[in-house]
Amino acid sequence: MLPLKFHEGGLIPVIVQDQKTREVLMMAYANEEAVRLTESTGSAHYYSRSRKKIWKKGEESGHFQKVGRILVDCDEDCLIYEVEQTGAACHTGYRTCFYRTLDGVTIGEKIFDPEKVYGKTGH
Amino acid sequence: MLPLKFHEGGLIPVIVQDQKTREVLMMAYANEEAVRLTESTGSAHYYSRSRKKIWKKGEESGHFQKVGRILVDCDEDCLIYEVEQTGAACHTGYRTCFYRTLDGVTIGEKIFDPEKVYGKTGH
C-alpha cells in the first residue's frame, strides 16, 4: 500500500465514482482506519467530521458501496473509490450528490424519498 | 449562482472531470475569486495553498482546462469542473493525477515528459 498523506485531523478526501457509468457520486473524508476497513471488507467506509466516528456507507440507508479499486493521486493526499452503488449515493434521494449546476439547475435523477429511507429526523 | 460554503481559509474542494471520457483528472482547491474567474473566463482557475495565490491551470504548462459545466454537491461545499483537457492534467506527465492504485500499480497513461514542459526546477 502506498504511503498516504493524511491531513486536517488525520483525514484524506475521497472522491467516489461509479465504476461503470464513471459518474462522480459524492466526496467524503476517510481516516487511516476507514481506508483499511474499506480495503479489508470491500465496502466503503468514511470518517464523519460532525459525528467524529467512522461510518460505513449504507449502514442506515441500505445504500452500500461495493468498492472495486482504490486509486491514489500524484501527491498521495487524495483517493478515488471506484464503486458499485446500491440505490443512490446522496441522502437527498438523488443518485449523485452533484445533482445541480452552479446556477441551481437540477440535472440529477431522484431515486428514493429520503423520508421513507431515513425517517423524518434527517440522516 | 448557488451560495457556496467555503471552508479551511475560504477554500472549496474541486473535483476535475473530463467531460467526454468522465475520467477524474485531479482534485484542487478554489476560493471564491477562482470560482468567479472560472465562470467568467471559461478556463479553470484554482487557489494554491502553498503559493498562496490564484493560478490558472495551464499558465505554465500550456495544459489548459476549458470548463463546460460546474456542478455543486448537496451540501454546497464541493464542486465539479467538467473540462476539456489540453494535454495532461498531472504535472508528472500522466493524463490524470490518479494514475496508480492504492497498491502502487501504475494504470495511467503518460502523455508528456515533465522536464521538457516545466524545466528541471519542478512545477
From Swiss-Prot, chains A, B:
The keyword Metal-binding applies. SUPFAM superfamilies: HisI-like. HAMAP family: HisI. The keyword RNA-binding does not apply. It holds the Pfam family PRA-CH. Pathway: Amino-acid biosynthesis; L-histidine biosynthesis; L-histidine from 5-phospho-alpha-D-ribose 1-diphosphate: step 3/9. One of its GO terms (cellular component) is cytoplasm. Its cofactor is Mg(2+); Zn(2+). Its EC number is 3.5.4.19. GO terms for molecular function: magnesium ion binding; phosphoribosyl-AMP cyclohydrolase activity; zinc ion binding. It is found in: Cytoplasm. Catalyzes the hydrolysis of the adenine ring of phosphoribosyl-AMP. Belongs to the PRA-CH family. It catalyses: 1-(5-phospho-beta-D-ribosyl)-5'-AMP + H2O = 1-(5-phospho-beta-D-ribosyl)-5-[(5-phospho-beta-D-ribosylamino)methylideneamino]imidazole-4-carboxamide. Binds 1 Mg(2+) ion per subunit. Keywords: Amino-acid biosynthesis, Cytoplasm, Histidine biosynthesis, Hydrolase, Magnesium, Metal-binding, Zinc. This is Phosphoribosyl-AMP cyclohydrolase. Homodimer. Mg(2+) binds at residues 73, 75, 77. Its main location: cytoplasm. GO terms for biological process: L-histidine biosynthetic process. Zn(2+) binds at residues 74, 90, 97. It comes from the Archaea.
